Curated annotation (Swiss-Prot):
It comes from Escherichia coli (strain K12). It comes from the Bacteria. A lipid is attached at residue 19 (S-diacylglycerol cysteine). This is Uncharacterized lipoprotein YbjP. The keyword Signal applies.
């Protein structure tokens, strides 16, 4: 009788531990070499656009906490290349050449998968009475959410390609 209780207890304990252990789809989100901005993907994107509107500059080092390591490297390399000077002199983070007066980033709360590595978020931008929409791609580096790309959706696009990355990559 003593062994029968023990033989029932062990499988039940294993079954219970198997039911309560949840592993994320991606165990490692990589490392991050730069500083970090606190918040979820939509919060970090909103802080980025608020910072850009307030400071009105394309200083890559000041924007570094908001950008992925790869995008920051691409922008830094592009800033030394005369072929990309016009794009970087204007607003590379928007479809339009001039900075917006306001920006509203869509909520990421509607995204069902908490383990998502890439989260595209729509951004409603306005300058005066004109409004347009772009899309920002957020990724997770380590524990930080950062901007990895901007998709230009705003109609009169000043860039040479449909996304920021495509516009500054040397092909």
């Amino acid at each position: 009788m003593r062994y029968s209780k023990l033989t029932m207890l062990i499988p039940c304990a294993l079954l219970l531990s198997a039911c309560t252990t949840v592993t994320p789809a991606y165990k490692d989100n990589g490392t991050r070499s730069g500083p970090c901005v606190e918040g979820g993907p939509d919060n970090v994107a909103q802080q980025f656009y608020d910072y850009r509107i307030l400071h009105r500059s394309n200083d890559i080092t000041a924007l570094r906490p908001y950008l992925s390591d790869k995008l920051a490297t691409l922008l830094s390399d592009a800033s030394r290349d005369n072929n990309h000077r016009e794009l970087l002199t204007n607003d590379p983070f928007s479809s339009r050449t001039t900075l917006p007066d306001s920006a509203h980033v869509a909520s990421a709360s509607t995204i069902p998968n908490r383990d998502a590595r890439n989260i595209p978020l729509r951004v409603d931008l306005k300058q005066g009475d004109q409004g347009w929409q772009d899309e920002v791609l957020m990724i997770q580096e380590g524990q930080c959410w950062v901007i990895d790309d901007v998709r230009y959706l705003g109609g009169s696009v000043h860039a040479t390609a449909g996304t920021l990355r495509q516009s500054i990559e040397n092909r």
